[in-house]
Amino acid sequence: MSFTIFGGRIMFNLLGDYITSRTNISEESLNIIFSHFQPVKARRNEILIGFNEICKGYYFVNEGCLRLFTYNVDGNETTRYFGFKGGFCTALPSFIEQTLTHEYLQAISKSELLYISRSDFLHLVDTVPQFAIVYRGILELGFVNAQKRIYGFQGFNALEKVRWIIKFQPDLLLRLSNKMAASYLGISPSTLSRIKSRI
């Protein structure tokens, strides 16, 4: 499905597809949703939400990729989540609770995004039932993915982690650099390269 509102621009196509793939919704309601999102461009490596900041909004990825990461006690980057094209991404605990973040939200490539403020997002949840369904789906997917990763990684060595990723999230190894994928797996890039060459 294509949408050409806002002067004929098609910046809302992917967001429209995301919503209509999850719920039945009228064009009128879609346009209400679209009117609350603003187009934003991010540079490669740009930090969108900093450590110890309060998250004020949500991003939908039209092009590019976002990630949530922090630094471990050894000073190494640890990535918790990647937001790929066609999906939502934010520092969710801070977004919900309005507490300080313990991570960074970064564009890892030049990205075209749609941004919605927290107040507008919650307004849509309260006033557009289909958007509430979408939000519930985001929360459920986030919970399931987090549980898979936590329990999937428990007690795994490096090889088992890579095999787990190949089984459950194969796109990560195809779409990301070794450095980024390794930061998600909690192993070194050289270890990841060595394992990939053997599999």
Predicted regions and their residues:
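Cyclic nucleotide-binding regulatory module and flanking cytosolic helices
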Residues: 2-38
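Phosphate-/nucleic-acid-contacting segments
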Residues: 4, 156-199
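Short beta-strand segments in beta-sandwich/barrel cores
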Residues: 38, 65-70, 112-113
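His/acidic/aromatic-lined binding-pocket segments of jelly-roll/cupin-type domains
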Residues: 39-40, 56-61, 80-81, 184
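Glycine- and acidic-residue-biased ligand/ion/polar-headgroup-sensing regions
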Residues: 45, 56, 60-67, 85-86
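Short phosphate-coordinating micro-motif centered on Lys-Gly-acidic
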Residues: 48-53
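Cyclic-nucleotide recognition modules
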Residues: 79-136
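Short, Lys/Arg-enriched N-terminal segment that forms or immediately precedes the first helix
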Residues: 142-151
